[in-house]
């Protein structure tokens, strides 16, 4: 691992293979974080999730009676994610934190003209954000009718559209990077899914993945590595507009899954604590808090010791790298 790669894995991430000291809390460290939170002195480091990532900007559209049902359904999510018309602040804030993680993980490694495939991109908000930052993006989803909805919202940037099963399509060349955001928890065979995604990336390229953190202390779903026969879930995967999760991947499953797919793990970032995510009946508290305070709470929670983050944080972002084979 290069010096640049090592620095990118901290302070937000977990270094693959790192050993925990077993210390959950340090009183001086906790006091320092509380003081920073109180006086708004939390640092903005170059590899932090609140630095060098543009705010969400997208063409404002308004629902029309003649829109397809899939557009109207997607629009309800855009009201929360993009346009700031909150009915669930926890969901909206969690999306914003996830978006910042995704963009950070790409911009730390890729030049602006890189080619990125966004698999299961739905209403295309990540595709549009990446395109506006100068990347050459290919939007992909099983729902072809959503492509025109993405076109309606886009103002600038290059996006190609490739609807269908990404693993069955013929692309002209491997991509510099692939994004799989909030999809692997919906498939019966996450190991096979990651392996097929890796085949779409050129050597030296990257996969950025986000998914709920299976080690979160209130997660009721099974661990993939504990399931003897994942095929029993095949009938319920890839449902259109499906919100049902099959497995939630645990951080300690990431490295074995990567090895099976021929990938290296560069960074595992755990983020979105239960308060900023609106869990544990905290939504009413979020309504009383300025978003800047919410963001500082989120930033502070990402500086907890690794064992605490592993079980306390709700979401996970991973950057994989496909190694260049030696000659």
Where are these regions (language model features)?
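A short beta-strand submotif of the Rossmann-like class I SAM-dependent methyltransferase core
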Residues: 180-183
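Conserved beta-strand/loop positions that form the S-adenosyl-L-methionine
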Residues: 119
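Conserved alpha-helix/loop element of class I SAM-dependent methyltransferases that forms part
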Residues: 94-112
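Nucleotide donor/acceptor-binding cores
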Residues: 113-114, 164
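A short acidic, Gly/Pro-enriched loop at the edge of an enzyme's catalytic core
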Residues: 167-178
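S-adenosyl-L-methionine-dependent methyltransferase catalytic module, highlighting the catalytic core
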Residues: 28-42, 46-97, 142-149, 153-154, ...
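Class I SAM-dependent methyltransferase SAM/SAH-binding core
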Residues: 125, 129-168
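Conserved glycine-rich SAM-binding loop
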Residues: 122
